[in-house]
């Protein structure tokens, strides 16, 4: 294919569920490649497998792509001259092309039942052979075909794979790749109901939509020789292919939808309060890297930098720790109001903040979130981070390390003195808390960790956390006095 041909790439999901992280990466790399080359990014819906399609699957895919920050030049919702953009609406395009292959003797009708095919596969496996179709319907005469149809058999259509050919292509990621045609076997291009199979529809659509580059996951590489054979049968020029390495988990195993250790769907990250810009950034680095050590880039910077030559030849590690770090970098840059907006739905869902909160409660939420602004990695994290602000005094428990601190003989007088200081206050503000702690130090003669740690542990239930005077201010006078009093009564 000519390198000067206009870049046209596509993301072609099946509407079988939510947008998976692997599919999001495929879409993103195609998007970046198109935008970098001032080309076209197309969304095509591959919905011919009606049994697997789910309600709202198509809408969910596009909604989440938009949320991540991608737009496209053609698609179901952006009509163009290469439509329709749903494969289910392109049947009238596929049928004459299938017939053309039949007429040329490059395809044939196959009447084998699923049971026969399964028996054939099992026999091949038992003999240590690679399972593939034997071609037994390849040489049926017209009379034999008519007899089969008279008996009620409906044919599928199989492509005649030429013998003893080496199918070679230069891959953008893997360099030169070759397959032997003898290992492929005649493959189905139209099912018994006349619906084309994936490989046929994809090859036809990519050609008719003038797709210049096909950038997709490594799990598709075995489809590529079949698609090239279809291109060759019609005398078409194949696109340039690029097969990205798979995404693996920390055990270096291929990311599986059954792997519960990793959240794998964009919708879930969205629901947890991750930022789209951060996910865009993280996904863009899954199997691709820029020059240098920097890891945080804007969408515009990624578009400017993106070069498929920098796609990794090694599997891409999905690192949860890295993802939360990346998201935290973006959260830290947000204005506090935006972080409150990100956090509030999760506090409300947890039932610790009113669904219909008044201005005073909203002001309090601003103070609460400000304590964790630098630390928060995503919106929902505010709930576990701030749980000590909502706990009853009676429910607070201490671990062994905390108990050891509270067992020091000076602790009761520190807590008593601090309680007395707070009881004298009309308003609990951080500055007043600081002054109160200084007065406790003067009165008791206790300073440093022996002073601060018991106060922190008894008031917050934690040894570590936000700046103590600020945390006590946000807790509020009533709650703090209750916790101090409860501890004194029990010790």
Curated annotation (Swiss-Prot):
Keywords: Aminoacyl-tRNA synthetase, ATP-binding, Cytoplasm, Ligase, Metal-binding, Nucleotide-binding, Protein biosynthesis, Zinc. Its EC number is 6.1.1.17. Gene3D superfamilies: 1.10.10.350, HUPs (3.40.50.620). It catalyses: tRNA(Glu) + L-glutamate + ATP = L-glutamyl-tRNA(Glu) + AMP + diphosphate. ATP binds at residue 257. GO terms for biological process: glutamyl-tRNA aminoacylation. A motif ('KMSKS' region) lies at residues 254-258. It comes from the Bacteria. SUPFAM superfamilies: An anticodon-binding domain of class I aminoacyl-tRNA synthetases, Nucleotidylyl transferase. InterPro entries: aa-tRNA-synth_I_cd-bd, aa-tRNA-synth_I_codon-bd_sub2, aa-tRNA-synth_I_CS, aa_tRNA-synth_I_cd-bd_sf, Glu-tRNA-ligase_bac/mito, Glu/Gln-tRNA-synth, Glu/Gln-tRNA-synth_Ib_cat-dom, GluQ/Sye. One of its GO terms (molecular function) is ATP binding. Catalyzes the attachment of glutamate to tRNA(Glu) in a two-step reaction: glutamate is first activated by ATP to form Glu-AMP and then transferred to the acceptor end of tRNA(Glu). Monomer. NCBIfam families: gltX_bact (TIGR00464). Belongs to the class-I aminoacyl-tRNA synthetase family. Glutamate--tRNA ligase type 1 subfamily. This is Glutamate--tRNA ligase. It comes from Listeria innocua serovar 6a (strain ATCC BAA-680 / CLIP 11262). The gene is gltX.
């Amino acid at each position: 294919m000519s390198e000067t041909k206009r870049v046209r790439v596509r993301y072609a999901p099946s509407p079988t569920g939510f947008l998976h992280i692997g599919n999001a990466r495929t879409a993103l790399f195609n998007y970046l490649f198109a935008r970098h080359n001032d080309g076209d990014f197309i969304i095509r819906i591959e919905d011919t497998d009606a049994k697997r399609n789910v309600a709202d699957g198509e809408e969910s895919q596009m909604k989440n792509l938009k949320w991540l920050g991608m737009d496209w030049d053609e698609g179901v919702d952006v009509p163009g001259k290469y439509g329709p953009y749903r494969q289910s609406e392109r049947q009238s395009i596929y049928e004459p092309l299938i017939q053309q292959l039949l007429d040329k003797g490059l395809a044939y009708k196959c009447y084998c039942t699923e049971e026969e095919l399964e028996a054939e596969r099992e026999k091949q496996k038992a003999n240590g052979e690679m399972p593939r179709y034997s071609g037994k319907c390849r040489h049926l005469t017209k009379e034999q075909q008519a007899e089969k149809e008279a008996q009620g058999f409906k044919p599928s259509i199989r492509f005649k794979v030429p013998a003893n050919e080496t199918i070679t292509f230069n891959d953008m990621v893997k360099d030169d790749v070759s397959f032997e045609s003898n290992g492929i076997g005649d493959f189905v291009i139209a099912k018994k109901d006349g619906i084309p199979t994936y490989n046929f529809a994809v090859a036809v659509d990519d050609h008719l939509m003038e797709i210049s580059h096909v950038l997709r996951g490594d799990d598709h590489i075995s489809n590529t020789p079949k698609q090239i054979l279809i291109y060759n049968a019609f005398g078409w020029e194949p696109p340039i292919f690029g097969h990205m390495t798979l995404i693996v988990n920390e055990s270096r195993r291929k990311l599986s939808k059954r792997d519960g250790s990793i959240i794998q769907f964009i919708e879930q990250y969205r629901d947890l309060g991750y930022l789209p810009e951060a996910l865009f950034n993280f996904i863009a680095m899954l199997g691709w890297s820029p020059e240098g050590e920097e890891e945080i880039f804007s969408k515009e910077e990624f578009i400017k930098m993106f070069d498929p030559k920098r796609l990794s030849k090694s599997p891409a590690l999905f690192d949860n720790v890295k993802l939360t770090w990346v998201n935290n970098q973006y959260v830290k840059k947000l204005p506090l109001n935006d972080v409150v907006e990100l956090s509030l739905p999760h506090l409300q869902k947890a039932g610790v903040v009113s669904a219909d909160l008044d201005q005073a409660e909203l002001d309090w939420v601003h103070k609460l979130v400000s304590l964790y602004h630098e630390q928060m990695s995503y919106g929902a994290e505010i709930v576990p981070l701030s749980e000590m602000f909502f706990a009853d005094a009676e429910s607070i428990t201490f671990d062994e390390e905390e108990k050891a601190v509270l067992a020091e003989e000076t602790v009761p007088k520190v807590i008593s003195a601090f309680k007395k200081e707070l009881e004298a206050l009309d308003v609990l503000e951080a500055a007043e808390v600081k002054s109160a702690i200084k007065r406790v130090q003067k009165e008791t003669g206790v300073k440093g960790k022996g002073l601060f740690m018991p106060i922190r542990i008894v008031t917050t239930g934690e040894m570590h956390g936000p700046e103590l005077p600020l945390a006590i201010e946000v807790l509020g006078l009533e709650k703090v006095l209750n916790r101090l009093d409860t501890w004194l009564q029990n010790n």
